[in-house]
Regions:
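Acidic, low-complexity cytosolic segments
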Residues: 1-26, 35-113
Length: 113
C-alpha cells in the first residue's frame, strides 16, 4: 500500500476514534491538524486559541527534547497541568491533541484512538 494512502487511512481511523471519545467524561476536546487544515472540537470555544498555542508549543518542545537527547521519533507527548492535561500524537504530517481533565487515563485514550 502506498505511504500516502496508508497515512490517509490512519488519519481517517483517528477521526473515527476522536468522534468516539469526545463525549466521554473528562474529555475537553481535540484539535486534529494537518498541513492544510484543522478540525477543532473544544467544549469551551473561548479557549480555542489557548489550546491551539499549547498544542503547538508542547509538541514542538517534545520533539526538540527528543532530538537533543537522541530519543528517536516521538510517538506521543503528554503535558500535565494543575487541572488539565493534553495528549499530543504526531501521525505523518498530521497532529492530534486531545485535551482532558488531569484525572483521565491518557493511556486509555491513546489506545482508544
Amino acid at each position: 500500500m502506498p505511504e500516502k494512502s496508508k497515512s490517509f487511512e490512519m488519519v481517517e481511523g483517528l477521526r473515527l476514534g476522536l468522534d468516539r471519545i469526545k463525549g466521554e467524561d473528562g474529555i475537553i476536546g481535540y484539535i486534529l491538524r494537518d498541513v492544510k487544515s484543522a478540525s477543532i472540537d473544544i467544549r469551551d470555544p473561548s479557549k480555542i486559541i489557548d489550546y491551539a498555542v499549547l498544542s503547538s508549543t508542547a509538541l514542538e518542545s517534545g520533539e526538540s527534547v527528543s532530538e537533543v537527547f537522541g530519543l528517536g521519533d516521538v510517538s506521543s507527548v503528554v503535558v500535565e497541568g494543575k487541572d488539565v492535561k493534553v495528549l499530543l500524537i504526531p501521525i505523518g504530517s498530521s497532529r492530534v491533541s486531545v485535551f482532558m481533565r488531569r484525572d483521565v487515563d491518557h493511556e486509555k485514550v491513546y489506545k482508544d484512538l
